[in-house]
Amino acid sequence: EIGSGLVGSEMCIRDSEWSIPAANITDIPQFEYRGLHLDVGRHLYPVSFIKKYIDLMSMQKMNRFHWHLTEDQGWRIEIKKHPKLTEIGSMRKETIINRYSAAIPGIYDGTPYGGFYTQEEIKEIVAYAKERYITIIPEVDLPGHMLAALATYPELGCTGGPYEVGTRWGIYDDVLCAGNENILSLIHISEPTRPEPIS
């Protein structure tokens, strides 16, 4: 792979004055897919952090960035056809801050939390990764882990709600209704990996 080879060569000459000693370097990755995952659905990271993350991936010769963009706790990608996804689905009213169970009630911080990436920011990150020979794989959970979308469009659920953006971790019973054809318009969001605008 060219990208991996360039990273390896750059490491050899980092502290020199751009001369490469005579050498034969054999640097073949053991695995074709060398990826790292980042969950921004539960916790939003700034673009600057994601770029640093991609830089560190490149230094380790990783080639796939698995970007977890949606979750019960937040919808993080701007979809122009569905602006309510970011107006409503990107914000949760608070976040649980303790371990909880049936016997231990949840303790919440009482602080609204959220945000999302604009199409322009996503394109910027995709281009940044591509320059470092890293492919972005956007992830949208289906049919579960979709409370952020259900809070926005309750008619897409099997029960009709009411729903709210998730404030605790774990598994929720509410999911998208697989028989509802309207959910198809939500799942075409892998388009940020293309140069055209996301619709």
Predicted features along the sequence, with ranges:
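A conserved hydrophobic secondary-structure block that centers on an alpha-helix together
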Residues: D39-D72
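Hydrophobic faces of well-ordered beta-strands that scaffold small-molecule active sites
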Residues: R34-L38, F65-W67, I136-V140
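Single conserved hydrophobic/aromatic residue that forms the stacking wall/gate
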Residues: E1-G8, C12-I13, H188-S199
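Active-site-proximal loop/turn and secondary-structure-junction residues that shape catalytic pockets
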Residues: R42, L69-Q73, K81, V140-M146
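Contiguous, structured surface segment used for ligand recognition
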Residues: G3-S4, S9-F31
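Flexible hinge/switch segments at interdomain interfaces of large molecular machines
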Residues: A23-E32, T159-T167
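Aromatic- and acidic-residue-enriched carbohydrate-binding clefts of CAZyme catalytic domains
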Residues: Q73-E131, A148-E181
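An active-site-proximal structural segment forming one wall of the substrate-binding cleft
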Residues: M62, I125-P143, L176-S190, R194
